[in-house]
């Protein structure tokens, strides 16, 4: 079994100031997006759209605002609405944690709509350009989660080579043993708990880095290396992220204040299903439009 390194959440101490790893990952995500965006400017069809370095900088400014505002509001509405409605001032305590990818996605989408309107560009042309820049940021965010030892996975067989002990999960592990006696006996988890006072879990943050970050990045980079019908790159992102998140959620521990919802699915899975369906619909629409209106549909217009 592996043991979580239990990193110090503070990455850098600057006198009275403390820079946390998770905050540092936002900076890493921002820089990575700039690098990927500038590399994409070298593609002939992207250059033909008239994108500039200033466009990337301005777009990321909108994107950061959309991510923070949407991510926070999404967490408030999707995950802990009753608590925040009772304590509305706590909504502004972002330093205490609580961000939602799906909320951040909606926030970024609205931000890109505004950016497209101001630049008089097609909204889908903007999202097609942005989509390959996103996975590196997702990977950085999940790395921040792993360093913090949070958002760990579900309990698993200790014989699994990837099973990991998370100290932060220890307070919940005794209750898990009581609630799942048969599985505990099958996996000999009582013995493990007696020795470590913790239970082995999936390092689901690392799974998300691999699928939502690395794999999705290469899929989008490969798919977008040549011109595609407008909306197709955005569609592949929606489908790819939705499938990756839906899959990883089977190994990720559900939020304790929500648990599993209808059909035994988590909130993350229910929020990912619409992304997959919309992505499939958008992909079909974009290729049909390209076939019937080739002069208007290709992403280089």
UniProtKB/Swiss-Prot annotation:
Binding site for a 1,2-diacyl-sn-glycero-3-phospho-(1'-sn-glycerol): 142
Pathway the protein contributes to: Protein modification; lipoprotein biosynthesis (diacylglyceryl transfer)
GO CC annotations on file: plasma membrane
Protein EC: 2.5.1.145
GO biological process: lipoprotein biosynthetic process
Its membrane topology: Multi-pass membrane protein
Main location: membrane
Coiled coil ranges: none
Transmembrane segments: 17-37, 59-79, 97-117, 230-250, 265-285
Keywords for this protein: Cell inner membrane, Cell membrane, Membrane, Transferase, Transmembrane, Transmembrane helix
Subcellular location(s) of the protein: Cell inner membrane
GO molecular function: phosphatidylglycerol-prolipoprotein diacylglyceryl transferase activity
Stored InterPro entries: Lgt
PROSITE patterns: LGT (PS01311)
Pfam families xrefs: LGT
Similarity annotation: Belongs to the Lgt family.
Function: Catalyzes the transfer of the diacylglyceryl group from phosphatidylglycerol to the sulfhydryl group of the N-terminal cysteine of a prolipoprotein, the first step in the formation of mature lipoproteins.
Descriptive protein name: Phosphatidylglycerol--prolipoprotein diacylglyceryl transferase
Organism name: Paraburkholderia phytofirmans (strain DSM 17436 / LMG 22146 / PsJN) (Burkholderia phytofirmans)
Gene name tied to this protein: lgt
């Amino acid at each position: 079994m592996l043991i979580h390194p239990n990193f110090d959440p503070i990455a850098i101490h600057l006198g009275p100031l403390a820079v946390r790893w998770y905050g540092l990952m936002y900076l890493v995500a921002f820089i990575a997006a700039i690098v990927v965006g500038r590399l994409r400017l070298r593609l002939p069809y992207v250059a033909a759209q008239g994108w500039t370095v200033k466009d990337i900088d301005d777009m990321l400014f909108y994107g950061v605002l959309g991510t923070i505002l949407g991510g926070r509001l999404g967490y408030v509405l999707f995950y802990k609405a009753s608590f925040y409605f009772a304590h509305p001032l706590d909504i502004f305590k972002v330093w205490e944690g609580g961000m939602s990818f799906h909320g951040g996605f909606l926030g970024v989408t609205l931000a890109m709509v505004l950016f497209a309107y101001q630049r008089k560009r097609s909204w889908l042309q903007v999202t097609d350009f942005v989509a390959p820049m996103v996975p590196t940021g997702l990977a950085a965010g999940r790395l921040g989660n792993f360093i913090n030892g949070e958002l760990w996975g579900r309990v698993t067989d200790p014989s699994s080579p990837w099973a990991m002990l998370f100290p932060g999960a220890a307070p919940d592990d005794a209750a898990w043993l009581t609630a799942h006696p048969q599985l505990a006996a099958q996996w000999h988890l009582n013995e493990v708990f007696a020795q470590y006072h913790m239970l082995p879990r999936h390092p689901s943050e690392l799974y998300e880095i691999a699928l939502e970050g690395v794999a999705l990045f290469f899929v989008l980079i490969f798919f977008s290396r040549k011109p595609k019908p407008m909306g197709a790159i955005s569609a592949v992102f929606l489908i790819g992220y939705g499938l990756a998140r839906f899959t990883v959620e089977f190994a990720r521990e559900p939020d304790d204040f929500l648990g599993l919802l209808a059909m035994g699915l988590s909130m993350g899975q229910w929020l990912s299903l619409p992304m997959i369906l919309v992505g499939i619909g958008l992909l079909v629409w974009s290729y049909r439009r390209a076939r019937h209106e080739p002069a208007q549909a290709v992403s280089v217009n």
